[in-house]
């Protein structure tokens, strides 16, 4: 352990806690997530639609497909000039590729213009308008807007409204787009909030992401701030980026699109503040490093980062305020070596400025500042109970073990005194865990006591054998005394073998056998006492009762033998066979009811069997009556 007066050592553990001022992003795209998203988009083309998702999605992330010329050739060869959807995918994908131009005939142009009609679906209108825009062809925006508005009144789904927003972003700014812009507020009202952290449509992640991307693209186009609150933007962001693996290309494309617009738009840019590992664990410096990025983990190097204040969690006292972070490469650093922080937890309120578009730019970090504990003024004493002899005191220095042994018996007590200090500052410490453990060297018995500080923060442990005999089970012997010190803010928890103490209890109180009190020994098996079975009647009684139950059956057989059973009239007609089988089945059902079924199940089966048996019996008796009449 470092001696007193050595250089300061700080160990910081950083956690982002919920700020009372605003929501903070809980989900965003880390650099690893961005690469995984790119990998999800970079797939072989299976059709023109997949090529669109892959090319435009990668372009949103600032990447390109591996072979742009090959991709352009694929688009040209798979384009169907008579299909509006095919033209849309080709136009948008070719725009994302440099030097990829696609020529369009007049017939194709007329096809696209004809699709911009209220007789077409919203999807068809969107694809036609976007294709015309992508190919650089002229379009009557006001007429397209009228067709879109008329069709939207018939399709009131969330996806149709989102596609209307996407369509409007391709129309001229001179057109009156207010009716479409007003749909944004209606869509926001239809969002579902989950736990105050997430906001999404019940249609799922893809629709939610397309809505956010379309909203900001349209608002950038018309030059109006979207009617979405900053907290709602963060909730939408948390919902969209909470998913890291994507089932389809379209889903990955939607996430890439929203990541692009939230990173670069004219109104709202969410800020992500992430601590970079832990602070420097050295004797020379204590530095808090923060990564300040957008949702794509791209550094906001032009930002300014300030510490508003740092408060102790325990006392709420402000220990540091109004301090700027220093930009170093892609991170921001705060060196607070010169500030006298005592060990404990602190809340650092950090604010990111430099752009009025920043949202979620105030974050609160919980910082744990650890230190090293030192043990000083350690005195071991034996004190005579009658005080006729002066106490014998031995001072010991950590981590050495005291020489010799100390005795505690009916005539003298044993006492331990010590103080705990901060090695770095010399201030007194009161850790959460300060224990004295006594371990019997022969039996393995362990007894643990809590050492408490007095008003002067001097820890004292006194062993009086007359008062502590219950804890020790009056087991005399040589005990090893350990001092245990621990705390979440201590860098060097201590387990110190301080001394050997001989403890003597009066012999008449000592147990004949000493059971180990080791906490880790197997416990004695618990013997359960179950209720004794009830007495049963004698075998004679049970046999007699069984015979009485069977007596009617025996009587039936006896009468049949005496009178004679008339089986000559038995006929093998279906009704006769079904009747007797049904009767036998009902008797069998009674047995099953007794062993397995409940009353309601039995009644259900009995209704079926009874109906069949009744009908068969009625038919059988009718046949017998006809037979008698004939004779």
From Swiss-Prot:
GO terms for biological process: protein N-linked glycosylation. It is found in: Endoplasmic reticulum; Endoplasmic reticulum membrane. Keywords: Endoplasmic reticulum, Glycoprotein, Isopeptide bond, Membrane, Signal, Transmembrane, Transmembrane helix, Ubl conjugation. This is Dolichyl-diphosphooligosaccharide--protein glycosyltransferase subunit 2. It comes from Pongo abelii. Residues 562-576, 618-631 are cytoplasmic. The chain crosses the membrane at residues 541-561, 577-597, 605-617. Residues 23-540, 598-604 are lumenal. Residues 1-22 form the signal peptide. It is a multi-pass membrane protein. Glycans are attached at residue 106. Belongs to the SWP1 family. Pathway: Protein modification; protein glycosylation. There is a cross-link at residue 154 (Glycyl lysine isopeptide (Lys-Gly) (interchain with G-Cter in ubiquitin)).
